[in-house]
Amino acid sequence: MLAARTGAAGSQIAEESSKLRKQAAFSGGSKDRSPKKASENVKDSSLSPSGQSQVRARQLALLREVEMNWYLKLCELSSEHTTAYTTGMPHRNLGKSGLRVSCLGLGTWVTFGGQISDEVAERLMTIAYESGVNLFDTAEVYAAGKAEVILGSIIKKKGWRRSSLVITTKLYWGGKAETERGLSRKHIIEGLKGSLQRLQLEYVDVVFANRPDSNTPMEEIVRAMTHVINQGMAMYWGTSRWSAMEIMEAYSVARQFNMIPPVCEQAEYHLFQREKVEVQLPELYHKIGVGAMTWSPLACGIISGKYGNGVPESSRASLKCYQWLKERIVSEEGRKQQNKLKDLSPIAERLGCTLPQLAVAWCLRNEGVSSVLLGSSTPEQLIENLGAIQVLPKMTSHVVNEIDNILRNKPYSKKDYRS
């Protein structure tokens, strides 16, 4: 039956495996009378018994590798059949954890349950998933919980394997009552239960503390996060908008009391905001293994180019609750940023990409970034931003230096000062 399933490709691999097995046996016990082989045999015979056993072990390891590759191809589980290979979407480890996440993820802030319809949300998730994205991020506060409801409904409707997804949510603002907000043990446990009900999931892969809470002792926060992980409600936990000192304190408390430390920090990162991700988080990564999941690669749409001639009516900055964004755009600093974006346009044209694609690829060129969360309100925007994957190989050191010379905002680490 197994032979029947292999087909022509399986037979060929089986033949290669058989040949390699014969070669291994031949080299281990037979003699070749050709001058070249004879000299090699003399050389082999001069090896000590331990040396010969090491050679034999290497041959057997190679044989096992060939047979394993043959079996994986037979089961369509080889590297050529993985989602990363077939879609071209690179995957990276989340910090120093073993969790593999697509280097681009889809966020739901503002869009799901607010700026877009449920139908558009489904279309966006479908495009992302079929493009190799496995990371979907939300929060209990997004659209007062509606974003989680929409995200969970789409996952259930699509029938995607839960094991193929990385779902993350964030806790802090759960309701109007004092006990429904913050990072108390009560709200972390009850808030996550509420999120799981809205998502229609048994667990999330990562639960984030959406901001620091000065009213709750760090030990209580870490104990509560450890508890929800031990209860199977989450796989990992992380922080969002925490300072490096606060993250380090959480790690120290976790190690002191044999609890689970955070694996990731969610931080804003784009062409005009760099210091935390480029200076502070790399130190934390090397010291305690905390990775970076970044958001707002287009600076809430500022880098998209849509605000070059003012604020369009359909844009995010035109919404009542985003007057702060409008003020930022029309400010003196905002006008300077728009001028810098115009100077970056020739670089994008030379690389054959759009300015948003250049901006996202610029974020990805930082190997310390585990994943960049995209926020799109239309399928066209999402497809354009996903195209940054093709631009990433073009982000050479020369191109990065060109961008730095225009931005003139590169932060300096302690290492730079020492050098």
From Swiss-Prot:
Record GO terms (molecular function): aldo-keto reductase (NADPH) activity; carbonyl reductase (NADPH) activity; molecular function inhibitor activity; NADPH binding; potassium channel regulator activity; protein domain specific binding; transmembrane transporter binding; voltage-gated potassium channel activity
Name the UniProt record assigns to this protein: Voltage-gated potassium channel subunit beta-1
Record function comment: Regulatory subunit of the voltage-gated potassium (Kv) channels composed of pore-forming and potassium-conducting alpha subunits and of regulatory beta subunits. The beta-1/KCNAB1 cytoplasmic subunit mediates closure of delayed rectifier potassium channels by physically obstructing the pore via its N-terminal domain and increases the speed of channel closure for other family members. Promotes the inactivation of KCNA1, KCNA2, KCNA4, KCNA5 and KCNA6 alpha subunit-containing channels.
Reaction(s) catalysed (UniProt annotation): a primary alcohol + NADP(+) = an aldehyde + NADPH + H(+); a secondary alcohol + NADP(+) = a ketone + NADPH + H(+)
Source domain of life: Eukaryota
Comment field on protein domains: The N-terminal domain of the beta subunit mediates closure of delayed rectifier potassium channels by physically obstructing the pore.
Gene Ontology CC entries for this record: cytoplasmic side of plasma membrane; cytosol; juxtaparanode region of axon; potassium channel complex; voltage-gated potassium channel complex
Species in which this protein is naturally found: Oryctolagus cuniculus (Rabbit)
Primary localization: cytoplasm
Residue ranges of the region described as Disordered: 1-51
Active-site residues, Swiss-Prot/TrEMBL: Y142 (proton donor/acceptor)
Protein's membrane topology: Peripheral membrane protein
Skewed-composition ranges (Basic and acidic residues): 30-43
Assembly and interaction partners: Homotetramer. Interaction with tetrameric potassium channel alpha subunits gives rise to a heterooctamer. Identified in potassium channel complexes containing KCNA1, KCNA2, KCNA4, KCNA5, KCNA6, KCNAB1 and KCNAB2. Part of a complex containing KCNA1, KCNA4 and LGI1; interaction with LGI1 inhibits down-regulation of KCNA1 channel activity. Interacts with the dimer formed by GNB1 and GNG2; this enhances KCNA1 binding. Interacts with SQSTM1.
The gene coding this protein: KCNAB1
Tissues expressing the protein: Detected in portal vein myocytes (at protein level).
Cell location: Cytoplasm; Membrane; Cell membrane
